[in-house]
UniProtKB/Swiss-Prot annotation:
Reaction(s) this enzyme catalyzes, per UniProt: N(6)-acetyl-L-lysyl-[protein] + NAD(+) + H2O = 2''-O-acetyl-ADP-D-ribose + nicotinamide + L-lysyl-[protein]
Note on cofactor: Binds 1 zinc ion per subunit.
GO function terms (MF aspect): histone deacetylase activity, NAD-dependent; histone H3K14 deacetylase activity, NAD-dependent; histone H3K56 deacetylase activity, NAD-dependent; metal ion binding; NAD+ binding
Chief subcellular location: nucleus
Family per similarity comment: Belongs to the sirtuin family. Class I subfamily.
Signal peptide range: none
Residue sites binding Zn(2+) per the record: 192, 195, 214, 217
Protein name, per record: NAD-dependent protein deacetylase hst4
Organism: Schizosaccharomyces pombe (strain 972 / ATCC 24843)
Keyword annotations from UniProtKB, A to Z: Metal-binding, NAD, Nucleus, Repressor, Transcription, Transcription regulation, Transferase, Zinc
Length: 415
């Protein structure tokens, strides 16, 4: 064979070696992008990467779903044994259980009664449940000033019972914001479909056929009747949770909180117990992940299921399996003090007892409705319909039925 014939073979061999080297480099880059996977089913699993990520973090953001409360006896929504499936079987529904959580549920009396029965049951389960190890872990992070924010999709109010995880309803429009941001509302509170009325949840409100009329709306109509004015449509009471195809009453506040948290440069994101199906939650996770990676921090996924393709490339650490088991094993490694449940019952003063509108529990506050500004104690009284009624009654001469004083009405802001 001539020398000229050897040259193409040598060149082809070199080309193949270069391609092989490039492919190996690409494979290495791909592997470096894949998250580290830990399975709680393996008793010998090394949790040191998870411990290291949490220890070095100073500003942790946590996004949670129903999976963190299953161990407390509260069902999730989408699993085969979840709330949607059980509702369909219990009430023999032709529709999916998800449709009971749609904003159109109040258009049909039968759907309303089923929805209210489900709400009473869910509130009872939540009220009797105890926070899980993961809830206590979140409280510990807050007490150690490592938790920047907790965004929860849960309505069971287990988080807000614990120290450091307080929230308020409605959310304020400007800082300071509470540690816990309920993305879907809470079963601790009922609200009016028309006015700004808020009250602590009472199961008796939903233990009847149909709906319960808002007391503030009834009082307002009584004032208007005495003043010789036309009556207005009265709202009804409902749990202050966000249903599918509804506008979130605190959407602007949540957007402001997210913007502020991104500016605070979080260095760790923990996504726990959620499949991330809600578009708004997806956006929060993606934006927070990008911000965390800019700070050279870690994005941690804790769930039975592995992350979807949308989130797989965002995660640095995937802990797949029972997240309660993971936290129990993590606890001694972090050298955390004993995590004790703070007493949910607190002594109330006579002033607090006289006003359920001021405070629901030791951890969840009811604040003034969004958009109402009060300049003084006198002006805040004038916004109260009961005070207006008192004014009107005092302005009536007996026996002459004559109104001497024109009554002004503060238009309540819709939720």
């Amino acid at each position: 064979m001539k020398v000229e014939e050897h040259v193409p073979l040598i060149q082809e061999s070199r080309k193949r070696k270069c391609q092989s080297s490039e492919n190996a480099s690409k494979r290495q880059q791909l592997l470096s992008k894949l998250p580290l996977r830990l399975h709680t089913g393996n008793e010998n699993v090394d949790l040191s990467p998870l411990v290291s990520a949490i220890r070095k973090a100073k500003r942790i953001v946590v996004v949670t779903g129903a999976g963190i409360s299953c161990d407390a006896g509260i069902p999730d929504f989408r699993s085969s044994e979840g709330l949607f499936s059980s509702l369909r079987a219990e009430y023999k529904l032709n529709c999916s259980g998800k449709e009971l959580f749609d904003g159109s549920v109040y258009r049909d009396l039968k759907s309303v009664n089923i929805f209210h029965a489900m709400i009473r049951k869910l509130h009872m389960l939540s009220n009797n449940a105890r926070p899980t190890d993961f809830h206590l872990f979140l409280s510990q992070l807050a007490q150690e000033s490592k938790l920047l924010r907790l965004y929860t999709q849960n309505i069971d109010f287990l988080e807000t019972r614990l120290e450091g995880l307080q929230t308020c309803i409605p959310l304020p429009q400007s800082a300071p914001w509470p540690t816990t941001i309920p993305l879907h509302g809470t079963l601790e509170v009922v609200s009016c479909t028309r006015c700004s009325f808020l009250k602590k949840f009472n199961p008796d409100i939903f233990d009847r056929n149909g709906v319960t009329v808002c007391p503030d709306c009834k009082t307002e109509n009584e004032v208007r009747r005495i003043a010789g004015k036309r009556s207005v449509i009265e709202g009804c009471l409902r749990p202050r949770i966000v249903l599918y195809n509804e506008i979130h009453p605190d959407s602007e506040s949540i957007g402001s909180v997210c913007s502020q948290d991104l500016k605070s440069r979080p260095d760790c994101l923990i996504v726990a117990g959620t499949s991330c199906k809600i578009p708004g939650v997806k956006r929060i996770i993606k934006e927070m992940s990008n911000c965390v990676h800019k700070q050279k921090g870690n994005v941690i996924w804790l769930n039975y299921d592995e992350p979807t393709k949308d989130f797989l490339n965002l995660c640095d650490l995937v802990v797949q399996g029972d997240l309660q088991i993971a936290i129990r094993r993590l606890k001694p490694l972090l050298d955390a003090p004993s995590w004790k449940l703070k007493s949910h019952s607190a002594k109330r003063t006579s002033k607090q007892k006289s006003s359920e509108q001021t405070k629901i529990t030791s951890s969840t506050k009811i604040t003034k409705a969004i958009g109402l500004n009060t300049k003084s104690n006198d002006s805040s009284k004038k916004d109260n319909t009961s005070f207006q009624l008192h004014q009107v009654l005092n302005s009536i001469e007996i026996p002459k039925v004559e109104i001497k004083q024109e009554v002004e009405y503060a238009t309540p802001s819709p939720l």
